[in-house]
Amino acid sequence: MAPLSKALSVFMLMGITYAFNYDQPYRGQYHFSPQKNWMNDPNGLLYHNGTYHLFFQYNPGGIEWGNISWGHAISEDLTHWEEKPVALLARGFGSDVTEMYFSGSAVADVNNTSGFGKDGKTPLVAMYTSYYPVAQTLPSGQTVQEDQQSQSIAYSLDDGLTWTTYDAANPVIPNPPSPYEAEYQNFRDPFVFWHDESQKWVVVTSIAELHKLAIYTSDNLKDWKLVSEFGPYNAQGGVWECPGLVKLPLDSGNSTKWVITSGLNPGGPPGTVGSGTQYFVGEFDGTTFTPDADTVYPGNSTANWMDWGPDFYAAAGYNGLSLNDHVHIGWMNNWQYGANIPTYPWRSAMAIPRHMALKTIGSKATLVQQPQEAWSSISNKRPIYSRTFKTLSEGSTNTTTTGETFKVDLSFSAKSKASTFAIALRASANFTEQTLVGYDFAKQQIFLDRTHSGDVSFDETFASVYHGPLTPDSTGVVKLSIFVDRSSVEVFGGQGETTLTAQIFPSSDAVHARLASTGGTTEDVRADIYKIASTWN
């Protein structure tokens, strides 16, 4: 569909052409959000035939959680998205829903191991959690209990536009493994991928309340064998869900390691309330994941956090990309207040897609993330603001105007005399409304302060300050890249080893910024601000 000016897009619905406007207050201009209604976890991320598919948890009937189906959008560059019809519509939607389609993943079955392919067409196979709100006998003849969660599959022969559920045998993994059968209400979120070394399909799924992951293998995506378990380890403050398992390059060389990601709700990073995502680095032999010793901590609260902010959850990885091109997307919201954020007619957006790799930092294999969009198509190389300061005195610099959507590159010396250095963003003219992003030199921490960021009235925990550890680089320099949209701030620190993601809801005229050094001088400061255009234009 050809994009139109003024953030209007033309869509066909039931034979009627209409225009949709992506210019509402708080509507992200370079983050994906559905035209309308509720969205949560990214699902079925698949790169196939030059197209990035983004499926997502979606309520086709309203702006709150319910009627959970799979929405669908596609892109050629992870930047400009086209929303497609609902891919998997809750069974019975419009009357009595008997099955919802909870989170899952998708693969291209290029060798047609499933037998779903016809006439030379490669089947795309989605694996998802069937949630049954009522006890029933299914078309396959299987019986399920009220509120049961089971793993099912569906396939597409038209590159993901329409899907057929495998009713003859669904669910293909009906129950949690022994001895955890009692956990049938908390068995969900399968992540499936092809393991080339063993020539098997592998799926990892969550036994949520027990903080365990169950790993299965299959030859055909239909018949599954339990091969191992993982957990509990590290943070266990809430349920484990939305797991992932991916191989990543280490130090840009020939060596690799495997990474498990797992959502946690509640019990997110220190200082947050609600959900978060942790990760483990280790080895995977096709059946068993063995974590590295330095990725596991004593107790049940310390973790390797994928993001230290409050609004990055249910991160999922793309199938179909090469080892060096791995990309994850996270849900940019939080279960603590997600149903109450002040947006309309949609609720929730996705975070910027992130390129993932591992680097040895402080002798430890560490996840590093970089923002992955077609930046040259939406941002100029020439900054709208560029300043350097050999020494920035205590106090604030003159105000500059940024607009609502922009990127900030900041660097400064870790040997500065200041206690903190920060930039105030999305600020009102008198700076009574502002979001602060900065660095605490003594604690060696990034911080993001949204206590005065705009509308914080919808949840008592929203107005808060968040921190993430960041050691200066080998030259003693601290580097931050900050991406600001109409209702979000995403901070990438250092090489991407520390990120913080937070929603904000500022006034539309809060378009000012300034630098501030507190408790002394900040040395060798460079600040560049780049305008980012709307992807909907």
Swiss-Prot record:
Source superkingdom: Eukaryota
One protein family per Pfam: Glyco_hydro_32C
Subcellular location: Secreted
Residues with attached carbohydrate: 49, 67, 111-112, 254, 300, 398, 430
Active site as annotated: 41 (nucleophile), 241 (proton donor/acceptor)
GO CC annotations on file: cytoplasm; extracellular region
SMART domains: Glyco_32
MF terms (GO), sorted A to Z: fructan beta-fructosidase activity; sucrose alpha-glucosidase activity
Signal peptide: 1-19
Temperature dependence: Optimum temperature is 60 degrees Celsius.
Protein name per Swiss-Prot or TrEMBL: Extracellular exo-inulinase
Organism: Aspergillus awamori (Black koji mold)
